[in-house]
């Protein structure tokens, strides 16, 4: 027989016996009851004796009641009065809270009573005291935390401790001491022992309360406990924590580390298969106008061509005709506008773009209204609006039963190299999203200038998608496809795209790379510029521009012959410019179609994503497209069945983002020889260095928690302490990671000119042989340093990251591109080869993308979240810029003249609000001509700008929190890619310098003179060593470019870049000159096999290379070496200064000014190496320290 608590009465009833067994799945588990605490223990109330019938209810007159199963009247018995069945579960009297004391950071275990009134009453009974008469148990039962102090004052204990539970398990202790009573009442009369205290006297024992939100509990006891630092479990003596719990705590609970790694968001690479697209391809021609801010470039001609889906093309063509655009005679879909008037081109193009996006937006709105005929009645009944267009988006999405098939429209404004020039010139006119689109659209804008270019300028007009829902089956996503349910909105997107960002070359070279027809000839733009600036240009008798306007004599003759073939008597410079510009637009439009088809075919065939409707223009750059393909390949391989890439490939964020970025170190670029070198020189280049590095193992999996991380770090330190024993890069016992290290170099006779690591401690990146302190390095770098003889010590750092395993995560991506490139070479498919080469080289750059906390917005683009962040002090406005008013369309009111009488002028100083005389004469009137006593004032013209103040102001916003939130790029992969490239160069240095170990640096022969990121300039001795010791790394002798996990070893190849053009053998330069990094020249190339000679090579970064030659660079070096200060060498080139948003005075937003840059040509002055003699340079070392290093660090001497 079991006892159960009655529903309301404070008594227990006996349960009727039940002979049947309870089903196992419904059996109630009995919890052991805890003994009452000693201070609060009281006598239990015992249940009355059970009745003979076994029921707790009074027996009926008929004797024992019948069984409910047999008595039909029992169906009418209320459920509350039926005999309860089951096992008794006594309610818990106490709760347990484990928390951290905010004052001492001590873990605590707080045991508290769940029933405040009952516990406080029993506590008073145990201590032979009573509650104050004005404090009833009912008041205690309904009390919340706001009345706790009033209750304490009524109780008047000696002391009351209040533990308040805060966020994340932290408790704060406060002590309340009740005020003393007035005189005569503070002293209580003595009472006999074991007698209750007299009424009105305070309690004689302290109290302790726990506040959880608004709930108050009486604390039984507070005990200090221990807390595991790895899993956060509280324990008294010992405990066991699992690796899973440690990982969960580290990644999700710990307030310090839970935001260090973020899951990378994912969406399929393909676009919606029903997307309707319209492409407006355009180009502009400009002339130079001397404005208030220098030589500004003003457009005088704009040509555009339409392409895409036929219905949208037809609508755009008709709109252009209706707006007065001229049609080019050679193509019905090409229109143009020519006018030298400043701002006219931009105004007309803005009008067309506004009308076009308004036309497409209304088309989308019409289809939405047609699919929802109840919209008008609902808007009238619910909001009192006569037209649905007066609804807002927030109101529209509440429309019940939204129906229809969603539509997706995309408008692309495309050009070649427009983001760095054309769009900036036109931006002040065309950047506008205030078109008269219907009100229910949700309008968002993505505007991002970067490095002087407009990277994004996209506007989205969105409506609710009735078919949107959360995806649960991800099979379609694994194949790169998507459908109606994956989009929250149906939309019209207006996007600006630059084909230069997808080809990284000029339009002429891009046309050749993608097998497009290219027209011969070019235009004399200098003559056109002079024509618009001065009204004329120098020409021959037939009007053809003279030779000085062309690049050289050859270009002049070619273009003159091409024009003569047209049979025209007089050269029309404007018409010729129009034809050249229109032909450029035709080539760009063909390039757009070629890129769309070629990339879609590549993704479908080479990558194997047959369900992906890939559109390369959906993303603005080749880097973003390569990263999207990589994410899609990873998602297909891992099948995470979620909207991210899963827990195995994460992105470093917050503190870890800066920590990982510190391990990303740039390439090697410096000469170890300055001056003229008169001995054979060969140039070797690593074949696809970043592609080969990407195929090597990368860190994989969620980073280890601190406990497992410490074990992995100890294994690394034990391996590093074994001096003289080389570590295998692919030792499975050593896990990948990023560490903070100290490293000491070996003896200087064991060093060489190719250090294994570089440092920024001196403010500039230096490849140095000095000791390293506090550097952030990958585990690959640890092996490289150790194998080169360095002593490496791991510095304890809570940010140290160790991953659970290696994985060739990017190998499949690189293999696809290499296979496509080889297939393109066999099939002579230049387009496929260009795509594969670009994608192969772009992935590393996407990993290394640097994020910041800044963004640039227009005043009218700041949403509610941004404004809230500014008011809360979380976002600062770093600078504000205003658009140049000359670039805005304006209306000018002409000058006018008004006359005033003396009486009217007397009102000039009066307050308008003081005059209530409605019969007073108006101050403006036109008196008869020649009226005496009147004064005439002539008002200057007034300019009314056609723009809102929000359209004219750009704000640069920056978050106050300097930590970067990253959920897009796995930046640590970039660290390991660069680390593998350093391992390649380290092995290369072994081929050249291992035989010199033990010989002083000054006594060693010259083997290399210049090192670039992926190349090395070697002498004849170095060339022989490459052909012998490094033979397996030379491509012509065979070898692999892709890492093989079955046979793990460093995989990289080089080839000689200086080859003979006649026989293909390795050639050398007999004489060379080196002035500075990226400033050198090879006089010529000589082939030792066939004796042929060819043109050398010249590199002059930042200089106009066409104005330099080998002899000039030799003269420059000799003049500097001989101290001839009077003789100066320089180069000049025309540069375009682009300003998008700047706080600098004189730099106005959205302007392009033309300037002439003059740069002095001279040898390297601010060197990052130490001089060994007149020509030779060496990396810094302990005997030749870096003079820039001023950082102080603690070093313990042995």
Swiss-Prot record:
Residues 1-87, 179-199, 904-930 are annotated as: Disordered. InterPro entries: DNA-dir_DNA_pol_B, DNA-dir_DNA_pol_B_adenovir, DNA-dir_DNA_pol_B_CS, DNA-dir_DNA_pol_B_mt/vir, DNA/RNA_pol_sf, RNaseH-like_sf. GO terms for molecular function: 3'-5' exonuclease activity; DNA binding; DNA-directed DNA polymerase activity; nucleotide binding. SUPFAM superfamilies: DNA/RNA polymerases, Ribonuclease H-like. One of its GO terms (biological process) is DNA-templated DNA replication. It catalyses: DNA(n) + a 2'-deoxyribonucleoside 5'-triphosphate = DNA(n+1) + diphosphate. The keyword Signal does not apply. Residues 30-40, 57-68 have a biased composition (Low complexity). Its main location: host cell. GO terms for cellular component: host cell nucleus. Keywords: DNA replication, DNA-binding, DNA-directed DNA polymerase, Host nucleus, Nucleotidyltransferase, Transferase, Viral DNA replication. Its EC number is 2.7.7.7. It is found in: Host nucleus. It comes from the Viruses. Pfam families: DNA_pol_B_2. It is an enzyme of class 2 (transferase). Eukaryotic-type DNA polymerase involved in viral genomic replication. DNA synthesis is protein primed, and acts in a strand displacement replication. Assembles in complex with viral pTP, DBP, host NFIA and host POU2F1/OCT1 on viral origin of replication. The polymerase covalently transfers dCMP onto pTP, thereby initiating complementary strand synthesis. Belongs to the DNA polymerase type-B family. This DNA polymerase requires a protein as a primer. Heterodimer with the terminal protein; this heterodimer binds to bp 9 to 18 of the genome. Forms a complex with viral pTP, DBP and hosts NFIA and POU2F1/OCT1 for initiation of replication. This is DNA polymerase. It comes from Human adenovirus C serotype 5 (HAdV-5). The lineage of its organism: Viruses, Varidnaviria, Bamfordvirae, Preplasmiviricota, Tectiliviricetes.
